[in-house]
Amino acid sequence: MITIFIAICTSTCLNLLLQFVNAHYTYNVALILLIVEISKLLLCLIGMLCISRQRNCPVRFGFIVNSVLYAVVNYLSHYITKTIPVSIYSVLIQHKLVWIVFFSILILKKSFTKQQYCALIAVCSGCILTKMTDDSMGDVAKRQMSTGLLLIALQGICSSLSSVWIEKMMKVTERPLISENYNKLYWFLADSFQMYLFAIPIYATSYVLGFGAPVITTLSLEATIIVILLSILNGMILGAVFVYHSSVIRSIIAAIVIVILAIEHNIYSIPIISGIGLVLLGVIGWTI
């Protein structure tokens, strides 16, 4: 329970910090992500050498699956948000909890009680309602919407499969958490570097043409360090959630964070209040 509580706190703080930073500053997101992944990799390496005294950590090629899925999810996110409004995307992507349950049954051979199924349905429905805003129902071209729905479904499948596969890889043998995180990050680092290279032409083009020049303050070094440190802590804690709990619990943590952020924003409507109630009901139903 301590791991879950810390994961909720770090995820909430990171989301609030990033919302504030995105509203007031400009920075290279891809570069920050690359620095975070490199830092987590080095931290795990130091942990293996100094804490667990592990000198030999064989590379586990099974994490390539996560690396490929991670890259697909990132590229789909970039394309989908250009196809349909972000408000619609943030609502529809919540369906991935259904896929996580499906892949947990298929790959991990897990079983759930009827009460747990009802709790997960409540959490999924609550996330959708909580994310729903007035502009979520805006007009979108039918062709764009149909394409967007297919891509969101594909992204939901890839993201959910990646979560379940991480759980499978990190629980398949009795190995230290640090070494498992090291193996996972070893392959994810390639994706982060690829994302950084992919972002360079976008930044270069926008600055040359003039419409990408920062109109708000550049993120300071101190704020950058805080973002990086909190991202590292959040990533390591979520890795522990996969080991000591499950990908389903990871999704429930994300749902709780959505509720906390909705309450913090002080924007209340019937869908949002209903969504908060459903998520809380689902969490209670899952735990009792």
Per-range role (PLM):
Residues M1-I288:
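Polytopic endomembrane small-metabolite transporters, centered on the Drug/Metabolite Transporter
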